[in-house]
């Protein structure tokens, strides 16, 4: 993806605005560096492979945890409900059947527990990403990754204690697991670091391909994780839960082996930084960091595309969709997980075959950025139509086509990321990716509260009201499609992109 210099934005590295939240290799001027490593002109395939392994492990581990966790929480909440209201309905010490758990009283408790757990996780990881990003800026990325890894351990222990010891810890105490993100900043910082490293290690001419491959790897891993989880859950929900945790920690282990990519500054700069430890200097450093993001205000296309990363998060993750399918269509969580896995399966040819072929043909006639913009318009429309169908579906026969339609727009976030990267300058990439991750995290915070409360409201009324959360998001995505439809790229961006394409 080309990185044109926009006529409306000028940056002088000497005025301090180039100080990034999470700097890339190219984020600092050559004069301030004391390193014999040249600027990235060719892709660093060794680093890309390591990052690919990390994404594969995390991409399998995360989805593999979600459905078993929901089922275990549902089982415990269901047993607690019947113990309080009619103990004679309980089957004994063995696992309670899912059919007894689909009543609104139990599902509202499950939605509350899972939803607020997502809220606290997203809120704290978003809050602490900034200070730990400053730490990564000054002391390096390896230290930030190690602290985040310790935070993951604390999060896992505190989150899963109520599952393993339900007679000691109430289910809602799993919300305290979010405290683990106070140490290390959590997923927001990690993914900001990873995407920044990908940008550092990838040449401009290969960035689109690399981003697409990472997206394919994540979706493929999610599909395999959901299929495996759905099958194993029929026997024991705890097995895929622990397997997913193992994969997550394996990914973190590889992340701790990544090389340091923060460039060393000159001795004069280092001494100056070490002696500036007063509160006043810290305040101005934070102010300078925040001020460095003002390039968004001068880049109109970037400013109008950025909210799309927020809106796409409002649909919630697979955990909410699995629970919705299970409740609405009276399916087990394992069966609902399999339906979501089929949706993921369809996204693989969309990302791997359909989008690249369409993109290649389009670029024979229009520039790279124009092609990305057109594909983004089509993809977000498919997302909106798919969610509209999911929210209105009254049977599996109408749900499945809606899931496939939604899967057809699965490339939107990746396309939008590539588009917005091409509209920004090279030295703005690290800050832009951090801003994208923060925007998505804010979307996750909002989504967890929004879906939890709107789904509980819909459960109390039943019928089509249960699908209300997805209907509202489909309307917001339609607005994004309208904004992208009237968006026009700066002429200079189009020329720069066209020149780098051929």
Curated annotation (Swiss-Prot):
Any one GO cellular component localisation term in the record: plasma membrane
Spans through the membrane: 45-65, 114-136, 150-170, 175-195, 214-234, 239-259, 302-322, 336-356, 380-400, 403-423, 464-484
Gene3D superfamilies: MFS general substrate transporter like domains
Region (Disordered): 1-38
Annotated PANTHER family: TRANSPORTER, PUTATIVE (AFU_ORTHOLOGUE AFUA_2G14230)-RELATED, ZGC:174356
Similarity section: Belongs to the major facilitator superfamily.
Stated name of the protein: MFS-type transporeter aprT
Species the sequence originates in: Aspergillus flavus (strain ATCC 200026 / FGSC A1120 / IAM 13836 / NRRL 3357 / JCM 12722 / SRRC 167)
Underlying gene: aprT
């Amino acid at each position: 993806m080309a990185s044109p210099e926009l006529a409306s934005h000028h940056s002088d590295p000497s005025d301090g605005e180039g100080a990034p939240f999470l700097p890339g290799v190219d984020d600092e001027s050559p004069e301030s560096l004391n390193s014999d490593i040249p600027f990235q002109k060719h892709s660093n395939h060794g680093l890309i492979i390591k990052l690919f392994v990390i994404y594969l492990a995390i991409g399998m581990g995360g989805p593999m945890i979600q459905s078993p966790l929901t089922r275990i929480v549902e089982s415990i909440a269901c047993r607690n409900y019947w113990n309080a209201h009619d103990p004679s309905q309980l089957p004994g010490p063995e696992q309670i059947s899912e059919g007894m758990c689909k009543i609104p009283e139990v599902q509202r408790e499950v939605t509350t527990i899972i939803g607020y757990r997502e809220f606290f996780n997203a809120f704290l990881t978003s809050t602490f990403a900034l200070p730990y990003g400053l730490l990564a800026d000054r002391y390096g990325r390896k230290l930030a990754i190690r602290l985040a890894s310790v935070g993951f351990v604390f999060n896992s222990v505190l989150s899963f204690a109520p599952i393993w010891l339900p007679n000691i810890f109430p289910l809602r105490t799993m919300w305290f697991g979010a405290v683990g993100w106070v140490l290390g900043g959590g997923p927001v910082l990690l993914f900001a670091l990873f995407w920044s490293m990908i940008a550092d290690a990838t040449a401009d001419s290969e960035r689109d391909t690399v981003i697409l491959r990472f997206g394919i790897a994540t979706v493929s891993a999610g599909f395999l994780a959901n299929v495996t989880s759905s099958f194993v859950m029929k026997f024991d929900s705890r097995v895929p839960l622990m397997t997913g945790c193992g994969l997550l920690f394996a990914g973190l282990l590889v992340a701790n082996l990544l090389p340091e990519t923060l460039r060393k500054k000159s001795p004069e700069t280092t001494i100056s930084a070490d002696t500036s430890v007063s509160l006043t200097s810290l305040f101005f450093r934070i102010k300078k960091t925040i001020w460095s993001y003002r390039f968004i205000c001068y880049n109109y296309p970037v400013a109008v595309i950025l909210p799309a990363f927020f809106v796409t998060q409002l649909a919630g993750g697979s955990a909410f969709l699995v629970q919705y399918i299970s409740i609405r269509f009276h399916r087990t969580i394992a069966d609902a997980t399999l339906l979501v896995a089929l949706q993921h399966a369809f996204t693989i040819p969309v990302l791997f075959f359909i989008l690249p072929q369409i993109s290649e043909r389009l670029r024979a006639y229009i520039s790279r950025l124009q092609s990305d913009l057109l594909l983004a318009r089509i993809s977000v429309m498919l997302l909106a139509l798919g969610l509209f169908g999911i929210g209105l579906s009254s049977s599996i026969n109408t749900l499945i086509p809606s899931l496939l339609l939604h899967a057809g727009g699965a490339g939107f976030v990746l396309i939008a990321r590539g588009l917005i990267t091409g509209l920004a300058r090279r030295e703005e990439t690290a800050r832009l990716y951090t801003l994208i991750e923060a925007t998505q995290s804010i979307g996750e915070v909002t989504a967890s509260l929004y879906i939890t409360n709107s789904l509980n409201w819909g459960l109390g009324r039943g019928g089509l009201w249960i699908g209300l959360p997805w209907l509202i998001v489909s309307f917001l995505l339609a607005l994004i499609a309208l904004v992208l439809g009237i968006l026009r790229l700066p002429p200079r961006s189009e020329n720069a992109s066209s020149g780098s394409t051929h």
